[in-house]
From Swiss-Prot:
InterPro entries: CheB-like, CheB_C, CheY-like_superfamily, Sig_transdc_resp-reg_Me-estase, Sig_transdc_resp-reg_receiver. One of its GO terms (cellular component) is cytoplasm. The gene is cheB. GO terms for molecular function: phosphorelay response regulator activity; protein-glutamate methylesterase activity; protein-glutamine glutaminase activity. This is Protein-glutamate methylesterase/protein-glutamine glutaminase. SMART domains: REC (SM00448). Gene3D superfamilies: 3.40.50.2300, Methylesterase CheB, C-terminal domain (3.40.50.180). The active site is at S210, H237, D334. Residues 173-185 have a biased composition (Low complexity). Residues 198-392 form the CheB-type methylesterase domain.
Length: 392
């Protein structure tokens, strides 16, 4: 006879009595979750965490004495625990949440913006799903960004890619200005002879990720060379208002331009475009250019805005075999349908290896479906992207 599964234990840390009560009611609705206690600030939260040892913590950012960011740092240093940040939909809240994710927070949930009704119901669905996912997290990956070596654009060795060759790949892109004649070569381990590279020139790179994504994106995007001859699109599951601060923060760490995409703009090589949270990002051909189409409409029914599937499907249609799709850490299987279409049209797929994923959900769907051309740990993904782009 099977023993009943023990409920997931949770500690709630929030300075608002209303939010503590609301979160407790929400989580207590699910028989698989048990709220052990609540705390009024970061200091009390740390003390109760040490005493109760919950599996998951929900934590507000702005609190007296010790705020959420300080408490997160202490917890990750001494007792790593999956922490779900609850953040207000404000510029300050979004910026603090991005810092929390980089410091090792599991995920972010947006607090209700005003009217209880629908907002509370949406919060309940999101929070319960993320608490259950957090309980399965690879604790060893929280806050880690992967062992990556910088891919230098000033390497002494000349890679097989040249500016002349790249022009055949990027004839639909707006010029980003003058670039060096060689793409930064990939340092470190070279590919095994048995590992296949794309059959067709890569015109565009698209990356999809969810839980654990901000840290993973930092590990990958900041290691790409400044003369990358193709554009990069990113769909990261986040609450509305949170992708702009993330892109802005990463932009300061990268030799490439990283920002939110703008509806109607032409894609440029050497620029990384984030899909705005709450919207869908697709591409459309206009003459010799690829144009971003950003809006509310979605060609498929999906819970995610932005959706990796929507982005991938658009690229499969407009770019086809010139698409390099990358799926990294995240819950669920968003990206599976779109990646299948990319592969059907001759494109190439990279999936993050289980060993480095915070949550091995989205990449696992790609691997289990037999779609991945290459499965790589986080620290090697940037190198593989460069090797695929410079493939002739």
């Amino acid at each position: 006879m099977n023993q009943p599964k023990s409920p997931i234990t949770v500690l709630i840390v929030d300075d608002s009595p209303f939010m503590r009560l609301t979160l407790q009611k929400i989580l207590s609705q699910d028989p698989e979750i048990k709220v052990l206690d609540t705390a009024r600030d970061g200091k009390e939260g740390i003390e109760k965490l040490q005493a109760l040892r919950p599996q998951v913590v929900t934590m507000d950012i702005e609190m007296p004495q010790i705020d959420g960011l300080q408490a997160l740092g202490e917890i990750m240093r001494w007792q790593p625990t999956p922490i779900i940040i609850l953040s207000a939909l404000t510029t300050e809240g979004a910026q603090a949440s991005v810092k929390a994710l980089e410091a090792g927070a599991f995920d972010v949930v947006a607090k209700p913006s005003g009217g209880p009704g629908a907002d509370i119901q949406a919060l309940a669905r999101d929070l319960i799903d993320k608490v259950k996912a957090a309980a399965q997290v690879n604790l060893g990956r929280l806050g880690k960004k992967g062992a990556v070596s910088r891919i230098s654009s000033a390497s002494g060795s000349r890679p097989p890619w040249t500016a002349g060759a790249a022009s055949e790949n990027t004839n639909r892109l707006s010029s980003p200005g003058s670039t060096s004649s060689t793409l930064g070569s990939a340092k470190g381990r070279s590919l095994d002879s048995g590992e296949a590279l794309p059959k067709y020139p890569v015109e565009i790179v698209a990356i999809g990720t969810s839980t654990g994504g901000p840290s993973a994106l930092q590990a990958v995007l900041t290691q790409l060379p400044g003369n990358l001859p193709v554009p990069v699109l990113v769909a990261q599951h986040m609450p509305p208002g949170f992708t702009a601060p993330l892109a802005q923060r990463l932009n300061g760490m990268s030799p490439l331009t990283i920002r939110e995409g703008v509806h109607g703009e032409a894609l440029k090589a050497g620029t990384i475009y984030f899909a705005p949270a709450g919207k869908q990002m697709q591409v459309q051909s206009r003459g010799s250019q690829l144009i971003l189409h950003i809006g509310d409409e979605s060609p498929i029914t999906t819970l995610y805005h932005p959706s990796v599937d929507v982005m991938f499907m658009s690229l499969a249609k407009e770019v086809g075999k010139g698409t390099l799709g990358v799926v990294m850490t995240g819950m669920g299987n968003d990206g599976l349908r779109g990646m299948r279409e990319i592969k059907e049209r001759g494109g190439y797929a990279i999936a993050e290896a289980e060993e480095t994923c915070v949550v091995y959900g989205m990449p696992r769907a790609i691997v289990d479906a037999g779609l991945a051309n290459r499965v790589a740990p986080l620290g090697e993904i940037a190198r593989h992207i460069v090797e695929c782009v410079q493939r002739r």
